[in-house]
Amino acid sequence: MEPPQCVEELEDDVFQSEDGEPGTQPGGLLSADLFAQSQLDCPLSRLQLFPLTHCCGPGLRPISQEDKATQTLSPASPSQGVMLPCGVTEEPQRLFYGNAGYRLPLPASFPAGSPLGEQPPEGQFLQHRAEVQIARKLQCIADQFHRLHTQQHQQNRDRAWWQVFLFLQNLALNRQENREGVGPW
């Protein structure tokens, strides 16, 4: 059994800019020529598994393409049309106001010499962002593989129980024939 060719058919929203448009830089990291865009038509999603959008989230797709089946309109802002996950009735509160966030301890990997307001170079930001998105996509693929493996394991276990059941039924119903050795052999 050969592995499914799901990776080639995935929608490559990893290499799109934030506004959902494919990159226009020729030869750059966000170039649309690197990967062909296709619909989300993965063979794994046909096996009664969740489609990729359920485990990866909407990604960087435009709002019109987001899956709104798991979202509800927020009662706090019906005029703005803000979508919230099912079961959430209010928008999240801001954790910090003003400059209170600057008082948090810095992670050990943070460079000590750079000021807090300084932005990293744009190329480094795009590279980091693409790496994070690739990692999320790989995690999503791994989750689907795990679900498929678990489903196949469950089917094999069910098949084994049916074989045991049919064997016992054959023994119980055909006791005399089994004792005499009557059969196709």
From Swiss-Prot:
Under which name does UniProt file this protein?
A: Bcl-2-modifying factor
UniProt lists compositionally biased (Acidic residues) regions at 8-21
* InterPro entries attached to this UniProt entry: BMF (IPR028192)
What is one Gene Ontology biological process annotated in the Swiss-Prot or TrEMBL record?
negative regulation of apoptotic signaling pathway
Q: Where is the motif (BH3)?
A: 134-148
Query: What keyword terms does UniProt attach to this protein?
Result: Apoptosis
Quaternary organization: Interacts with MCL1, BCL2, BCL2L1/BCL-Xl, BCL2A1 and BCL2L2/BCL-w. Interacts with the myosin V actin motor complex through its binding to DLC2.
Q: In which tissues is it expressed?
A: Widely expressed with an abundant expression in pancreas, liver kidney and hematopoietic tissues.
The Swiss-Prot or TrEMBL record describes its family as follows: Belongs to the Bcl-2 family.
Q: Where is this region: Interaction with DLC2?
A: 67-75
One Gene Ontology cellular component annotation held by this UniProt entry: myosin complex
The function of this protein is:
May play a role in apoptosis.
According to the record, the residues making up region (Disordered) are 1-28
Give the superkingdom in one word.
Eukaryota
